[in-house]
Regions:
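N-terminal cap/leader regions of alpha/beta-hydrolase-fold enzymes
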Residues: 1-180
Length: 180
């Protein structure tokens, strides 16, 4: 697990306010290095990195955008409600919005219309920035869905939207040959 280096078993933390300081203390440089190492390890084990894809939720969704701007090996990504605009932070030097012009892989962004942290207006900003840069991305903003609509262990779970989003993710990965 990426966060295990913090010395804490994140599976034992059930309160988001206790979890986020640990999650947010990880620098982008370490994340990208770890993802590169994971892809290299998969290749060394016989994995077909010609079909390399990434999916993430919340902070992991942000990581999808970051890795799509970083890796020329990546074939496609899917970001479930990943943040697009970050407050200034030396650990995260650029937000996904600032990296729009650097995207190297197509990304599908799946967001909730009722997300209090990532309002639809931000999603539209990202969509416009990517289009202006000539990058490939699609977005779906799900009506009635809050942040975390795919987390079936939380009150934010929305079964219908989660199932639809999962199907869209699979179709996206098939389109870009990550899945067959």
């Amino acid at each position: 697990d990426y966060y295990y280096r913090a010395g804490v078993d994140l599976t034992k933390i059930t309160e988001i306010p206790k979890l986020m300081p640990i999650v947010n203390a990880k620098p982008d440089s370490e994340l990208l290095s770890d993802l590169d190492a994971t892809a290299a390890w998969a290749k060394s084990q016989g994995g077909d990195t010609g079909r390399l894809g990434i999916v993430g939720f919340c902070r992991g969704g942000r990581s999808v955008w970051e890795y799509a701007a970083h890796s020329s090996q990546l074939k496609a990504g899917v970001a479930f409600y990943g943040s697009l605009i970050d407050p200034p932070n030396p650990l995260w030097p650029k937000s996904p919005m600032q990296l729009a012009g650097d995207m190297k892989a197509p990304v599908l962004g799946l967001y909730g219309a009722e997300d209090q942290g990532i309002p639809p207006a931000q999603v539209e900003q990202m969509k416009a920035a990517l289009a202006a840069a000539g990058k490939t991305a699609e977005f779906h903003i799900f009506p009635g869905a809050p942040h975390g609509f795919h987390a079936d262990y939380r009150p934010s779970y929305r079964k219908e939207q989660a199932e639809q989003a999962w199907g869209e993710m699979q179709a996206w990965f098939r389109k870009y040959k990550v899945l067959t």
